[in-house]
Amino acid sequence: MVRTKANSVPGSYRKVVASRAPRKVLGSSTSAANSTPLSSRKAENKYAGGNPVCVRPTPKWQKGIGEFFSLSPKDSEKENRIPEEAGSSGLGKAKRKACPLPPDHTDDEKE
């Protein structure tokens, strides 16, 4: 909190509210005419993604983005298979035995 002159007066309390800095007005005819060449120049030099600090090559195993959008007929069959075939690779079908936990003797040692 910021101290103000009002804080020094006993019995009075005043809170100072921070405000934002004024923003530039976009839309005036003179600034729009002047900024058009600058904005087109910025668009050419604008950073478009990746890591500008340490550029690394794409690994061979990584799929391209286009492969996710264009599925082959073979892949689309896998997507639309019957619900009984889909699932957790058969783990749910096998019955699992309940394994009780061994008794915890840490409480006995503390006493």
Swiss-Prot record:
Carrying Phosphoserine, the residues are 8, 28, 31, 72
> One biological process GO term for this chain?
response to UV
Q: Crosslinked positions for Glycyl lysine isopeptide (Lys-Gly) (interchain with G-Cter in ubiquitin)?
A: 15, 24
User: Which GO molecular function, any one, fits this protein according to its record?
Assistant: chromatin binding
Give me the stretches of Basic and acidic residues compositional bias. Answer: 74-84
Q: Where is the stretch described as Disordered?
A: 1-111
Q: Where is this motif: KEN box?
A: 78-80
Q: Listed GO cellular component terms?
A: nucleus; perinuclear region of cytoplasm
Q: Where is this motif: PIP-box?
A: 62-72
Where, per UniProt, does this protein localize? Nucleus; Cytoplasm, Perinuclear region
Q: Where is this motif: Initiation motif?
A: 85-97
Transmembrane keyword on record? no
Q: How does it assemble?
A: Interacts (when monoubiquitinated at Lys-15 and Lys-24) with PCNA. Interacts with isoform 2/p33ING1b of ING1. Interacts with BRCA1.
Q: What is this protein called?
A: PCNA-associated factor
